[in-house]
């Protein structure tokens, strides 16, 4: 009898610990997690306290899985309205993966779906008791936010974020999304945070917090012209987390490619 009571107390404390732990969402994933994905998750939930993070693992290491883990954590923490901005070609893939791997229902919104079901969509977005995970293209993201400007978005995920790196001197879609999502916690995903120049990093980090590097002029003076790469690396640590394939070779198998000539 006493033994059963101790087991019940242990089970109660264990459940209470898991309920209060940020790691309980790791148990909800319908997948086998790799160590680097858990490390990325830990880095992300810490960074969300100060605005967000860029997860920049190399291709094939599961950034979408990492994003799903973080999304689960954010929802467990009380978030209700989540916007996922991504290339239009990836919307369906994300919808399927969120459902199959995390049991999360999402909706793809574009101009057509909004115009033809405006009342129902508006009702769902305005209902703060209901979770809404919205998948939409880069181009439509800003239009959606403007259309429902009274909606408070709790979290923003940007996939293939390098496409928006030229936020201050590129396409309007990057600048529009930057202006409209200021202050919203963000998760940026990209395998190539640095494509053409160091200023790519300035643009991406500015999405998280423009105060980190200041203006592009200041960034150029310190890092492009000054060449202080060690200081740049240190300042990136809290906002950029990257895993390379060579770091995970012990527990992940990659297919070998043969060049035929």
Regions found by a protein language model. Name each.
Residues 50-70:
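Walker A/P-loop
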Residues 104-114, 212-216:
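Conserved RecA-like helicase motor-core motifs
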Residues 79-100:
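Conserved Walker A/P-loop ATP-binding site and its immediately adjacent core
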Residues 184-197:
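Conserved helicase ATPase motor motifs in RecA-like P-loop NTPase domains
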Residues 58, 159-160:
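Walker B catalytic acidic pair
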Residues 123, 130, 134-153, 168-183, ...:
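Inter-lobe coupling linker of SF2 helicases/translocases
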Residues 45-46, 64-78:
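Walker A/P-loop NTP-binding motif
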Residues 1-53, 131-133, 138-139, 154-155:
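Charged, low-complexity
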């Amino acid at each position: 009898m006493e033994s059963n009571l101790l087991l019940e107390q242990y089970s109660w404390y264990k459940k209470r610990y898991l309920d209060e732990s940020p790691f309980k969402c790791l148990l909800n994933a319908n997948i086998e997690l790799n160590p680097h994905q858990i490390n990325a998750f830990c880095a992300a939930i810490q960074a969300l306290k100060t605005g967000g993070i860029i997860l920049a693992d190399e291709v094939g290491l599961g950034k979408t899985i990492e994003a799903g883990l973080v999304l689960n954590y954010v929802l467990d923490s009380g978030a209700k309205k989540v916007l996922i901005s991504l290339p239009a070609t990836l919307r369906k893939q994300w919808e399927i993966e969120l459902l199959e791997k995390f049991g999360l229902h999402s909706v793809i919104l574009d101009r057509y779906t909004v115009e033809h079901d405006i009342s129902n969509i508006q009702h769902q977005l305005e209902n703060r008791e209901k979770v809404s995970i919205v998948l939409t293209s880069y181009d439509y993201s800003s239009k959606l936010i403007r259309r429902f400007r009274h909606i408070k978005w709790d979290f923003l995920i940007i996939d293939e974020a390098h496409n928006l790196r030229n936020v201050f001197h590129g396409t309007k879609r990057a600048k529009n999304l930057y202006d409209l999502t200021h202050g919203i916690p963000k998760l940026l995903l990209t395998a190539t945070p640095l494509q053409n120049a160091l200023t790519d990093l300035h643009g991406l980090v500015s999405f998280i917090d423009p105060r980190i590097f200041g203006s592009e002029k200041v960034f150029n003076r310190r890092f492009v012209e000054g060449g202080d790469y060690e200081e740049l690396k240190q300042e990136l640590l809290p906002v950029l987390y990257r895993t390379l394939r060579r770091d995970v070779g012990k527990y992940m198998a990659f297919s070998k490619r043969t060049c035929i000539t």
